[in-house]
């Protein structure tokens, strides 16, 4: 809903880029590290928010929170990842929308129903706008919206609240 006009799909594209490296980690390192802990992780983009989540044993919580903090503050995917991930999102659109009549119907229905509201734009983005996305667009969106006062941290499990607060403040 917060995507700039003409940049539909930027939130979803950025979701993909969030796994492609920071100033201190290589592309895919986040996923490899989390998996090495025996943990699961994923992400999704909805109309109103993007969620990143991990299911991890409490003894690895500090490491996973540090990895998340790094990508939330220091995202820096290499150029080749920026281009290839845009192509991945374009292919995702082809598979999920363009090659699926019922998805096309719902996409057009939402566009007609919501008209001038941001919900008229598909989460994955309009194809012509996706093809124009680049790092400058993603970085601007990232710098504007990926800030602490715009995030919600949810941690559940066998742990002490004070410990989680201390980890979050690091």
Predicted regions, residues:
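Active/ligand-binding-proximal structured segments within catalytic/core domains
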Residues: 1-34
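Charge-rich, well-structured scaffold segments of protease-associated domains
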Residues: 29-170
